[in-house]
Swiss-Prot record:
Compartment list: Cell membrane
GO cellular component: Casparian strip; plasma membrane
Ranges facing Cytoplasmic side: 1-32, 104-115, 190-194
Coiled coil ranges: none
Function summary: Regulates membrane-cell wall junctions and localized cell wall deposition. Required for establishment of the Casparian strip membrane domain (CSD) and the subsequent formation of Casparian strips, a cell wall modification of the root endodermis that determines an apoplastic barrier between the intraorganismal apoplasm and the extraorganismal apoplasm and prevents lateral diffusion.
Annotated membrane topology: Multi-pass membrane protein
Lineage: Eukaryota, Viridiplantae, Streptophyta, Embryophyta, Tracheophyta
Protein name listed in UniProt: Casparian strip membrane protein 2
Regions of this protein lying in the Extracellular compartment: 54-82, 137-168
Keyword list, A-Z: Cell membrane, Cell wall biogenesis/degradation, Membrane, Transmembrane, Transmembrane helix
Similarity comment: family membership: Belongs to the Casparian strip membrane proteins (CASP) family.
Pfam families given in the database record: CASP_dom (PF04535)
GO biological process: cell wall modification; cell-cell junction assembly
Length: 194
């Protein structure tokens, strides 16, 4: 008794092997760009929300005051700082909401739709971030140096903590600007080399 079974071929022509998985499309670097995009978005979220939180909590009251007058410096005393806090919070919110689109770009690196959507909105929010950072930087400069022509005195000699917080918030916003510029450039590279 034999334990092997012989099965003859059904036809005279030998069949070839079929490829079950299509070979990967060229341009695997796009997946690396998409991963870098996701990581940069996380960094921009930290910079934008950190700038908004730092500026939003900047408040200092001097320890001396009179019966009718108390000396206080707060972000809500300056409309440029209010604009800064609102804008940086919006930018941080947008960046959080853009993470799923960035994740789709990782899964489907050759899809142009999510990439085009991100580059348009990244450019809009880059503009907002730059505008709010520049307006806050102008006020921080005046707080540090004053302006003799308009009788604006430098207040950072008295309100050192307030000025340190607002300065660090402005620096953090410009870190977010640099990261957003990198995101726009990465998206443009991924879209351009089709």
């Amino acid at each position: 008794m034999s334990t092997t079974i012989d099965v003859p071929e059904s036809s005279n022509v030998a069949k070839g092997k079929a490829v079950l998985v299509a070979p990967p499309r060229p341009g695997g670097w796009k997946k690396g760009v998409a991963i870098m995009d996701f990581i940069l978005r996380l960094g921009a979220i930290a910079a934008a929300l950190g700038a908004a939180a730092t500026m939003g909590t900047s408040d200092q009251t001097l320890p001396f005051f009179t019966q009718f007058l108390q000396f206080e410096a707060s972000y809500d005393s300056f409309t440029s700082f209010q604009f800064f806090v609102i804008t940086m919070a919006l930018v941080g919110g947008y960046l959080v909401l853009s993470l799923p689109f960035s994740f789709v770009a990782i899964i489907r690196p050759h899809a142009a739709g999510p990439r085009l959507f991100l580059i348009i909105l990244d450019t809009v929010f880059l503009t907002l971030t730059t505008a709010s950072g520049a307006s806050a930087a102008a006020i921080v400069y005046l707080a540090h140096n004053g302006n003799q022509d308009s009788n604006w005195l430098a207040i950072c000699n008295q309100f050192g903590d307030f000025c340190a917080q607002t300065s660090s918030a402005v620096v953090s916003s410009f870190v977010a600007v640099v990261v957003l510029v990198l995101l726009v450039v990465l998206s443009a590279l991924a879209l351009g080399k089709r």
